[in-house]
Regions:
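Single-pass alpha-helical transmembrane segments
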Residues: 1-14
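Membrane-proximal cytoplasmic juxtamembrane segment of single-pass cell-surface glycoproteins
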Residues: 14-37
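Conserved eukaryotic protein kinase-like
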Residues: 37-376
Length: 376
């Protein structure tokens, strides 16, 4: 689909009245650009599961801690070859398949030493178009270190194979949980904690990584959950380094997923961290309502979730907005704050959106209020 068509659809997601006040279809992803590369390497593996306890805004003690991120060729290697990968994935058996996306398919794999990892394999039929995405994900993942971001463990680039090896996150995607495909439905407290985790991960990318990173594809299917229902942001194929000069934006081709795309970015081709903030606002509405950004099977006045949510928010019908699968009562003051923050993040112009650090702080304050309300 051409870019103008995406622009029309995504602009339709924004209610014009936003400016006056600060389970349906699958995700459609914009095409990738081309690039070339030729190297083989892998990174050291380590423990991949860790329970993240609830805490205030979890930030690195100092940005300087990450100022000397090691280059790929300096990180301890596990020297995985294709025969080892084939054994670990049972020759890429469908029984090991745990996910699919724009880059390719993801498999659960057990290494010879017993470690369980995830191996993402590029689609061969789209190999040329996916080379840029592969390089971007490897290079950017190698520079980050945060509990709420999926950790890169290794990669293989040999012949016609492109593999990315990451930590294994066993809980599946957030979207699967919202669709009710898992054993238990997420309760409100879990959804609030997941929102905070994602905000922390994005804040790290924007402010505390060695260089500013803009994710560009924040969505529910790119949020992985641990067994204890803590969130990790995944899939950095569309990620882009922010500008390290005095500029306020990066001019670049539009990439991302329909329904989550910043309308100002689509109009001007100017990418900023506030583009991730917009996507997070859409995600937060998704977490609270259970609805996808666009649901064509619903009635006309409910197909675009942002429009529907804004109308309900102005009417003060917060409980009607809450995902009915939760089947629980939540203090309306808490819901008003949560939905209000989501709508503010999804403002049509970046100047009206908070930054991710502020979003995380507001969510933490909402969490404190929620815990107090539960004790009453």
């Amino acid at each position: 689909m051409a870019i103008p068509a995406f622009f029309v659809l995504c602009c339709a997601l924004i209610c014009p009245c936003f400016q006056a006040r600060k389970k349906g279809i699958g995700h459609s992803v914009l095409p990738k650009e081309l690039n070339s590369m030729d190297s083989v390497s892998s990174l050291e593996t380590n423990s991949v599961s860790e329970k993240i306890m609830a805490s205030p805004l979890r930030m690195p003690p100092s940005p300087s801690r990450f100022s000397m991120s090691p280059k790929l060729d300096r990180i301890g290697s596990v020297h995985l070859n294709m025969s080892q990968v084939a054994r670990a994935t049972r020759n890429f058996s469908s029984s090991q398949l745990i996910g699919e996306g724009g880059f390719g398919t993801v498999y659960r794999a057990e290494l010879p030493d017993g470690k369980v990892v995830a191996i993402k394999r590029a689609r061969k039929e789209y190999f040329e178009a996916l080379q840029t995405e592969f390089r971007s994900e490897v290079e950017l993942l190698s520079k980050i270190d945060h509990k709420n971001l999926v950790k890169l463990l290794g990669y293989v680039e040999k012949g016609n194979e492109r593999l990315i090896i990451t930590e294994y996150v066993p809980g599946g995607t957030l979207r699967e949980h919202l669709d009710g495909l898992k054993e238990k439905i997420l309760d409100f407290n879990q959804r609030l904690e997941i929102s905070i985790d994602v905000a922390h991960g994005l804040t790290y990318l924007h402010l505390y990584a060695e260089k500013q990173i803009i994710h560009r594809d924040v969505k529910s299917s790119n949020i992985l959950l641990t067994e204890s229902m803590r969130a990790k942001v995944a899939d950095f194929g569309f990620a882009r380094l922010g500008d390290d000069s005095d500029k306020t934006h990066v001019s670049t081709k539009v990439k991302g997923t329909v329904g989550y795309l910043d309308p100002e970015y689509m109009k001007t081709y100017q990418l900023t961290p506030k583009s991730d903030v917009f996507s997070f606002g859409v995600l937060l509405l998704e977490i609270l309502t259970g609805r996808r950004p666009v649901e064509l099977k619903r009635s006309r006045d409910e197909r675009v979730t942002i429009r529907w949510a804004f109308r309900k928010y102005n009417e003060g019908k917060y409980m009607e907005m809450l995902d009915p699968l939760m089947n629980e009562m939540v203090d309306e003051d808490i819901l008003e704050k949560m939905f209000g923050l989501a709508i503010q993040c999804a403002a049509p112009t970046r100047a009206d959106r908070p930054d991710m650090k502020s979003v995380g702080e507001q969510l933490w304050g909402i969490r404190m209020d929620y815990l107090k309300s539960e004790r009453r």
